[in-house]
Amino acid sequence: MALNLQDKQAIVAEVNEAAKGALSAVIADSRGVTVDKMTELRKAAREAGVSMRVVRNTLLRRAVEGTAFECLTDTFVGPTLIAFSNEHPGAAARLFKDFAKANDKFEIKGAAFEGKIQNVEFLATLPTYEEAIARLMGTMKEAAAGKLARTLAAYRDKLQEAA
């Protein structure tokens, strides 16, 4: 279906707004994936805080101009499905990676984070906010326990020297 100029401008503006508010983006080719599977992917994306859209490459190039995702323009070849992670930088990458495992025809073309093209594996393995806090707390707890042990050992050594 042909789009008139207003529709094209609306799509570019909508995608541009999504890109400006996103933490990361992932590009994929969904040729050969059934409608049912794509519906499942879209549902999972909504639940994960990921906005997904199939956009014409020329419109997508214009939409990402001046954003952190301009580096992805070389991947805009063939049918392009773009997903923006709004809450966590690794959400879209994790979603697409899991979906690609279950669907052979789904191909991830590229990903961007902080204005640079990134490996999808890197983005998918980024810890969530809760996981990062838990790791930090674990590190702090280990450091505190280690410091306590060293302090007690030093005190013991001091007492032995005095005796």
From Swiss-Prot:
InterPro entries recorded: Ribosomal_uL10, Ribosomal_uL10-like_sf, Ribosomal_uL10_bac, Ribosomal_uL10_bac_type, Ribosomal_uL10_CS_bac
Single Gene Ontology BP annotation: translation
Keywords of the record: Ribonucleoprotein, Ribosomal protein, RNA-binding, rRNA-binding
Transmembrane segments: none
SUPFAM superfamilies on file: Ribosomal protein L10-like (SSF160369)
Keyword Transmembrane helix: no
Entry keyword DNA repair: no
Family matches, as Gene3D superfamilies: 3.30.70.1730, 6.10.250.2350
Pfam families recorded: Ribosomal_L10
GO molecular function term, any single one: structural constituent of ribosome
GO cellular component terms attached to this protein's record: large ribosomal subunit
Record function comment: Forms part of the ribosomal stalk, playing a central role in the interaction of the ribosome with GTP-bound translation factors.
Oligomeric form and interacting partners: Part of the ribosomal stalk of the 50S ribosomal subunit. The N-terminus interacts with L11 and the large rRNA to form the base of the stalk. The C-terminus forms an elongated spine to which L12 dimers bind in a sequential fashion forming a multimeric L10(L12)X complex.
NCBIfam families tied to this protein: PRK00099.1-1 (NF000955)
Family as reported in the entry's similarity comment: Belongs to the universal ribosomal protein uL10 family.
The protein's name in its UniProt record: Large ribosomal subunit protein uL10
Gene this chain is encoded by: rplJ
